[in-house]
């Protein structure tokens, strides 16, 4: 039995009908929907100390509810003292209910906890209907307490939609409650 996530229900009951009305889709499968959310954490300092990677993976797993995959260096770069295959980051891909739960938490709890938050940058769409945002610290999530944190680590969040254009994607995310800057 799938979970009843409020944001998911909002999409099916309010957002989808509004998008059909606004853009005049002929078929419900044409309506843009969320495909996945990819969270990436670059940890350059992890090449010196493996414990940093473990701690960051623990925190990311708490935030997302899913074990992160370790990303490794594609090639060696001597200026960065980097060898091919060294662990340099973490990545989590959320789909279905986990994605909806994470987004609900991001929109309702995490973003409002950011100091001096004035809204998300409306220009961070990639031209293909996907939205990217960066967070400076992991403390804004309720699962992470101040005592657990050894260092502030940011993360990149990519919201992948089936929208063909940025205009459609922006309408979808705005209706879902993403707080864009005016």
From Swiss-Prot:
Pfam families: Ribosomal_L5 (PF00281), Ribosomal_L5_C (PF00673). GO terms for molecular function: rRNA binding; structural constituent of ribosome; tRNA binding. This is one of the proteins that bind and probably mediate the attachment of the 5S RNA into the large ribosomal subunit, where it forms part of the central protuberance. In the 70S ribosome it contacts protein S13 of the 30S subunit (forming bridge B1b) connecting the head of the 30S subunit to the top of the 50S subunit. The bridge itself contacts the P site tRNA and is implicated in movement during ribosome translocation. One of its GO terms (biological process) is translation. The keyword Amino-acid biosynthesis does not apply. It comes from the Bacteria. Part of the 50S ribosomal subunit; part of the 5S rRNA/uL5/uL18/bL25 (TL7) subcomplex; has also been isolated as a complex with 5S rRNA, bL25 (TL7) and DNA binding protein II. Forms a bridge to the 30S subunit in the 70S ribosome, contacting protein uS13; this bridge is straddled by the 5S rRNA. Contacts the P site tRNA. Keywords: Ribonucleoprotein, Ribosomal protein, RNA-binding, rRNA-binding, tRNA-binding. Belongs to the universal ribosomal protein uL5 family. It comes from Thermus thermophilus (strain ATCC 27634 / DSM 579 / HB8). This is Large ribosomal subunit protein uL5. GO terms for cellular component: ribonucleoprotein complex; ribosome.
């Amino acid at each position: 039995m799938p979970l009843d996530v409020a944001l998911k229900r909002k999409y099916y009951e309010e957002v989808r009908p509004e998008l059909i009305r606004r853009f005049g889709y002929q078929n419900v499968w044409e309506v843009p929907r969320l495909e996945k959310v990819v969270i990436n954490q670059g940890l350059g300092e992890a090449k010196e100390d493996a414990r940093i990677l473990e701690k960051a993976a623990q925190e990311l797993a708490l935030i997302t509810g899913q074990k992160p995959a370790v990303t490794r260096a594609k090639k060696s770069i001597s200026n960065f003292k980097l060898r091919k295959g060294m662990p340099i980051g973490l990545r989590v891909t959320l789909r279905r209910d986990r994605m909806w739960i994470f987004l609900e938490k991001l929109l309702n709890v995490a973003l409002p906890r950011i100091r001096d938050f004035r809204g998300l940058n409306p220009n961070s769409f990639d031209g293909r209907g996907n939205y990217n945002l960066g967070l400076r610290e992991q403390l804004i999530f309720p699962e992470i307490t101040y005592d657990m944190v050894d260092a502030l680590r940011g993360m990149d969040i990519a919201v992948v939609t089936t929208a063909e254009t940025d205009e459609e994607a922006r309408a979808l995310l705005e209706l879902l409650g993403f707080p864009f800057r005016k």
